[in-house]
Amino acid sequence: MSYGTINDMNESVTNYRIKKAQNNIKGWYAYSFSSEPFVVSAVSTYIPLLLQQFASINGVKVHDHSIPCLSETGSDSDKCVLGLFNNRIFVDTSSFALYVFSLSVLFQTIIVISVSGIVDLWGSVKFKGRILVWFGIVGALSTVAISKLNDTQIYSLAGLYIVANGCFGVINVVGNSLLPIFVKDSLKCQSQGAYEPDKVDSLTTVISGRGASLGYSSALIVQIVSMFLVASKKGSKQDVQVAVLFVGIWWFVWQLPMIWLIDDVTIPIRADDSTLASARSPYPGEQDALGQLNWKNYLSYGWVSLFESFKHARLLKDVMIFLIAWFIISDSITTINSTAVLFSKAELHMSTLNLIMISVLTVVNAMLGAFMIPQFLATKFRWTSSQTLMYIIIWASFIPFYGILGFFFNAFGLKHKFEMFLLAIWYGLSLGGLSAVSRSVFSLIVPPGKESTFFSMFSITDKGSSILGPFLVGLLTDKTHNIRYSFYFFFLLLMLSLPVLNCLDVKRGRREAEELSQVLPESERRLD
């Protein structure tokens, strides 16, 4: 074989790997484009409305349980409660939605922990892509099923939402864990092995920002189409369910390209290889006759691996700082959206169409925030990643502060419908920037080879706060029957996060993560 032929073969292999790396990034964009409408449109707008609507239809007046909630008998100011478990307990109709959110996130956390260890153990990008598609199909079909329920099936509504949200949690963790792998694969292929570490930071930020913008773009398209669907069903009880149906179909269809796009750039070591199974087994000696781990051990590996990762995270100062800060931030930012929807419906009596318009405003400005904040504002003013996060939090804290003003003033402080439209713009900018920056920051400070497990920690921190936040707001609403009091809770949390974020040093965190990855036992590294 001639020297020229060998060069041609090497060039062909290099081009093949570059194409694979580029396709993986396109597949990552498809993940964001297909699934983002579920959380932005369904979870943030439609599901809260459906839960409150079903609760109101099946609820009664708080002061007289013999009077249906939607009855014209009694005062308009009478609050409503929903009887659960054969009327053993009664909860505020707004609180019911919040309690379901908490329960769904608890289920999501359990399934995320179980699955994240499996994908790290398997060590194949293609397998992770299949996980995205499998759970996406189940989540999409559960969303479609929600659109077919009648208003008496309140427990079925809660159950299907819990399943769909659990599936979204899995693909969110696995999808985010693929980002640093795709970035490094792309740089390795383009530079044929060697690349500058600083390029990882910039490329991660760019791809993360584009992914967030694409996700919000898809959510915007879904919301605009949903406006026409809801308008065509105006006056019907099924108007929101038509929008939910469209979200489910969108999720199902647009995730399919990932089947062909996401693949291994290099041939991975097979997960069922006896050496890999032996090296990675959390239970040495418990492989089957073929040297393979059984599914019981695969599932438990996620919990064992997570426990080990928390032990390692204690050695990573900046990972711990970020996770503590994120727990506080997420508790406020994620809960405030669903609370605002319930507040708008219950207190301001806004129509479904108006709430979708607010959601569209939020999505448009989230796209701007995801694109402008990391790529222009942070660059222009030379903010560090941690500084950028702090400025976003300060910006976002105005929203609950403005809601608090409603206790003291009658003219403003979320007393009128138009104020919700203005705050939607404000919230969207902060949400988009936070989504793009937080993902890229955390991906920079996790040990190479442990992306899925550490992003599982990130998700668990996020979801742990999302279990607590809605639950506490639900208790507060049950006690006061006034959801406005939740704004005190949100404002306090955002203020508490600032001094924690001020301690974050991304460069130090990245250095410590790389050092830790070098000293991890061979059995705990991903075998590339």
Curated annotation (Swiss-Prot):
Pfam families: ATG22. The keyword Phosphoprotein applies. One of its GO terms (biological process) is amino acid transmembrane export from vacuole. Belongs to the ATG22 family. Vacuolar effluxer which mediate the efflux of amino acids resulting from autophagic degradation. The release of autophagic amino acids allows the maintenance of protein synthesis and viability during nitrogen starvation. This is Autophagy-related protein 22. Signal peptide: none annotated.
